[in-house]
Each structure stands twice: as C-alpha cells, then as structure tokens.
C-alpha cells in the first residue's frame, strides 16, 4: 500500500506540473530525457547475455554448485593483489591520466601535494570514499587507503569527481556550479578506464592482467561493491 501511494503521488505531481509522465519528471532531476532512459534499458537488454556469461564464469572460478548475489562480492583474484604506497599510486594515476592533457595532470599533481585528500584509515572515520565540492576553496576527497588495486582505482575515481568539481567551480558561478549524478559518474569512470588501460598496457604478468581486468569489470557490473560516490 505504501508503494502504491508513492506511485499515485508521483503520478499526481507529474500531472499537476504538466509532465507527460512521472518518468519524465523523474529523469529531469538528472537533466536527462525519457529517450535517454529508454535507450539505456534497451542497450542493457540487448547485451545482457554478456553479464550472464560473466556470472557463469565467476561461478566456475569460485567452484560453486550455485551462485547467489552474496557470492558476487567475492574476489577470486585476491591472491594476486599487491600493496602499493600511496605516493606510487598517485604517480601511477598521473601517468595514466596523461591523455587528459598537461593542464589537467599538473592541477591533479598540485591537488595531491596540497592536502585535498584525507587518505588513510583512522578511528571512527566513515568507510568508503567520497568527494565533497566546496565552492570558492577546492574539493575535499575522503579515502580509506590500504594499498590494494581497488584503492588505487579509487584514487583515480574520486579525483575524477574532484577535478570535475574544480573545473566546474572555476568556470561557473555559485548558483550554477553543481552537476547531476549522471554527469558526475562520466568524469570518474573515464579516469578509471584510463588507469585500467595504462596498467594493462604496462603489465607483463598474465595473472596480474586478469586481476586488473576483473577489477575493471566489478566497477561496471557490480556497482554495489562501491558504497560511495
């Protein structure tokens, strides 16, 4: 009944405000259109077989008779993970993001050297990772860095958000500098892809390449592995 009332409320508000549907009103929050939404669903459905193949392969790797949602969070390649000092991780990210241009890389290096990031675990600190834009100052990035491949990727991801915020603040006034979640995740995902490609291109060990490919996959196909933005 609660769900039904929510649907009725959304439908009524959409009608009162002259939207064609409650869906049109909902996607407008991300400055998207119904066409974009429908295209996304259509594309997912057309390629869902790839995800089925991936799930079957993971079941085989984990040697399970059946696979459940809680099994999907298990990393079968943990044994190939390495521990990387944060200074080395930052240098790796800088090299990987070189295609974004000298200005971008130099500003990112400045961010690393100017304490934009609270990187390490500490008592009572919240988990995950996060970027917080602060207009007129600079973005602040929260991490809980332990040196894993996932953490290295998180640096690229969160500073994708941070640099997006920096450039938006630099070029927009205080009323127009914010951006939608849909747009935000493009900036962060591009950084992750560039980092993954750079590491794959510069890796010679087969098992390391497989582990890096898996890391890229879970960021796309298992978004619940991320508990942050």
Predicted regions and their residues:
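Cation-handling catalytic/transport regions enriched in His/Asp/Glu
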Residues: 1-221, 225
